[in-house]
């Protein structure tokens, strides 16, 4: 039996993690975010009602679940307050269900200003960040000048630290980027206005998780973005600023690494990517447009159109290695309904003609990489909302089986629609 279950994306994000986390939290006592910030966009549809969460864990809608934001998450007080208000306006008692690590780095206005100034300065070489200050906040953390939730307990010292760090960043903004300085007093006043709310939710997350483990409580760890955006293992520099892989669970929450029992990789039935960066199977034809339209591939956070392409099992195999995946949840299978044929990328052809079965590491090494495809018959029948494996067309079952063969990982869950009821759980991670 797996008490500590990790749910993470195996591609470039947007795989459908939010729905699956929400579904599986029916049995969980805690749901933990361990990396990223409000650059994530988790969309839940329950009884036809849509909820988009960016920072608060997807378990917040469950009455008997405690949601936790771990130390690996960079926390924007403004974004958190906005999200809390939206949920509280709908009658959800967020403050009774949400806990924070005091070690969460804070995202403040100057981080956002830096993020946008840098993207503007990069011009055509822009990374395609969400412009929400995520990267600069992680930089401050590593440089040991960042302000954290725990600093808010001593307001006088916080004000002094803020003044010092803002002098540093404003100098950079004005003199290097030729941008406007950020107003110190406004940042201080805005942060102080919510300081007591934030500190009232602080808990020792590592200790809480260890006690939960000893009691045998079920805990779900909710990843943001996807494996191929990992700061260390992704398509650098076109990556996010955190560890999106399973290793980030231990460092971003304080759970001992030996206590992870099951890692569920969310796998979209095709590939998508937002922003710049390598994408060997990207489609620029009618099929690419079809996938975008049928899959409603527009970012929950930015509204940007996602790039679309065939499923890349070479890249997914890298995710299998990095995360020691226990099983997959296959999502958006229904988007492929109606295609005469479906393709799987099974290898890459390098510019020198070599065939390789593993992904390059740096973004520059992906240049000129061509996908080698295996083509399979598609299906005309609808898989939307199918709740039993026997109801799937044979061609869809063949597609699922081939993914399992190419990756060496079983597909334990199949999602056939956005609602939590439109799901087949073949093997429950908490029972694995």
Curated annotation (Swiss-Prot):
Its EC number is 6.3.4.4. GO terms for biological process: 'de novo' AMP biosynthetic process; IMP metabolic process. Belongs to the adenylosuccinate synthetase family. It is found in: Cytoplasm. InterPro entries: Adenylosuccin_syn_GTP-bd (IPR018220), Adenylosuccin_syn_Lys_AS (IPR033128), Adenylosuccinate_synth_dom1 (IPR042109), Adenylosuccinate_synth_dom2 (IPR042110), Adenylosuccinate_synth_dom3 (IPR042111), Adenylosuccinate_synthetase (IPR001114), P-loop_NTPase (IPR027417). SMART domains: Adenylsucc_synt. The keyword GTP-binding applies. Its cofactor is Mg(2+). The active site is at residues 14, 42. Substrate binds at residues 300-306. Its main location: cytoplasm. Keywords: Cytoplasm, GTP-binding, Ligase, Magnesium, Metal-binding, Nucleotide-binding, Purine biosynthesis. This is Adenylosuccinate synthetase. The gene is purA. Pfam families: Adenylsucc_synt. IMP binds at residues 14-17, 39-42, 130, 144, 225, 240, 304. Binds 1 Mg(2+) ion per subunit. GTP binds at residues 13-19, 41-43, 306, 332-334, 415-417. The lineage of its organism: Bacteria, Pseudomonadati, Pseudomonadota, Gammaproteobacteria, Enterobacterales. Pathway: Purine metabolism; AMP biosynthesis via de novo pathway; AMP from IMP: step 1/2. One of its GO terms (molecular function) is GTP binding. Plays an important role in the de novo pathway of purine nucleotide biosynthesis. Catalyzes the first committed step in the biosynthesis of AMP from IMP. The keyword GTP-binding applies.
């Amino acid at each position: 039996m797996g008490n500590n279950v990790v749910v993470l994306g195996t591609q470039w994000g947007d795989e459908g993690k939010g729905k699956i986390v929400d579904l599986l939290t029916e049995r969980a006592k805690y749901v933990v975010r361990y990396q990223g910030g409000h650059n994530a966009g988790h969309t839940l549809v329950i009884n036809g009602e849509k909820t988009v969460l960016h920072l608060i864990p997807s378990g917040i809608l469950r009455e008997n679940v405690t949601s936790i934001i771990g130390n690996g998450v960079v926390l924007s007080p403004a974004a958190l307050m906005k999200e809390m208000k939206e949920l509280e306006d709908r009658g959800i008692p967020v403050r009774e269900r949400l806990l924070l690590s005091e070690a969460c780095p804070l995202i403040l206005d100057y981080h956002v200003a830096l993020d946008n100034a840098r993207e503007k300065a990069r011009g055509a070489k822009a990374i395609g960040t969400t412009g929400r200050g995520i990267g600069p906040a992680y930089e401050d953390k590593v440089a040991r000048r960042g302000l954290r939730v725990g600093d808010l307990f001593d307001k006088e010292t916080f004000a002094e630290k803020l003044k010092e760090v803002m002098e540093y960043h404003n100098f950079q903004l004005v003199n290097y980027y030729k941008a406007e300085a950020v107003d110190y007093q406004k940042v201080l006043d805005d942060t102080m206005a919510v300081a007591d709310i934030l500190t009232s939710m602080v808990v020792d997350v590592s200790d809480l998780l260890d006690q939960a483990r000893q009691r045998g409580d079920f805990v779900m760890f909710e990843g943001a973005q996807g494996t191929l955006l990992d700061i260390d293992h992704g398509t650098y520099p076109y990556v996010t600023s955190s560890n999106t892989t399973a290793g980030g669970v231990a460092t971003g929450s304080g759970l001992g690494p030996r206590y992870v029992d099951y890692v569920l990789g969310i796998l979209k039935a095709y590939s998508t990517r937002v922003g710049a960066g390598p994408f060997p199977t990207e489609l620029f034809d009618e099929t690419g447009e079809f996938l975008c339209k049928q899959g409603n591939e527009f970012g929950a956070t930015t509204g940007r159109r996602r790039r679309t392409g065939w499923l890349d099992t070479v890249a997914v195999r890298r995710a299998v290695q990095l995360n020691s995946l226990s099983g997959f949840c296959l999502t958006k299978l229904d988007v492929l309904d109606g295609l005469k044929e479906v393709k799987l990328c099974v290898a890459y052809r390098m510019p020198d003609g070599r065939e390789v079965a593993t992904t390059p590491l740096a973004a520059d090494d992906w240049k000129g990489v061509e996908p080698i495809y295996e083509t399979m018959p598609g299906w005309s029948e609808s898989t939307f909302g199918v709740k039993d494996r026997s109801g799937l067309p044979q061609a869809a079952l063949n597609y699922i089986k081939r993914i399992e063969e190419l990756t060496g990982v079983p597909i334990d869950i199949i999602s056939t629609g956005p609602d939590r009821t439109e799901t087949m759980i073949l093997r429950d991670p908490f029972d694995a």
